[in-house]
Amino acid sequence: VTVVDDETEFKDLYTTITPNTFYANKLGDDAWVLNLPTKQVYNGKDIKVNPKNQRIYYDMPSDSTLVFIDMADADYQLLQNYSALSSAEQKALKNKVTTNKVRYNLSQDHVITVRSYAGTIKQYTLYCLIYPEFKTVTVNGVKGVLTRDAFNQDHQIYTFTLPAGTDVANAKIEYTLDGTGTFMIDGTEVVSGTTTNLAADKLSIERSSDANAQAKAVSNVEFVFKFQ
């Protein structure tokens, strides 16, 4: 029995930013999506995340698989003819294999090239998206206060202290976002200035990649209302 080492599929793609590890999710056959928060809770404080200087880690079933991130076109041409290269040329190319010492800007996308020991080459796009959040948000003119979830980075809790008797099922929401995105209630877009049911079950802010609309960062929003 001849076993051919032809592994080109990642088990995991991730980055670690103390105190959390952020795992990418597979999208289709040739893409992954990595979402990061703007801030994360660490020792009880909201700490700003710097996505522009982070490492990319991966788990691959075979140690013989070569992995390159943002490979130069000239090197990709060499990789396609790897078997025909001299041992010195092969070694030079292997020296460009990605290691966890290299840091990347995880606010932008990356192309990951994989070559199995058997010679199969596959390319993936790693879409990097920051979870969207409200820059400002008010309900009937009252500002919401954001509390971050230390264990669920996509969960954002906004607390509003409203006058007693306020009907939150028929309230006016005004907001700005911290970038591109769409505020949704039960799957329907709600624009700023709308009077609507803010006691609905599913509130979210969705951000899609400009390069691939299927690549998204979705923030699960919770509104907490206090009355006085």
Residue ranges: model-predicted function:
Residues 1-228:
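Beta-rich interaction/scaffold domains
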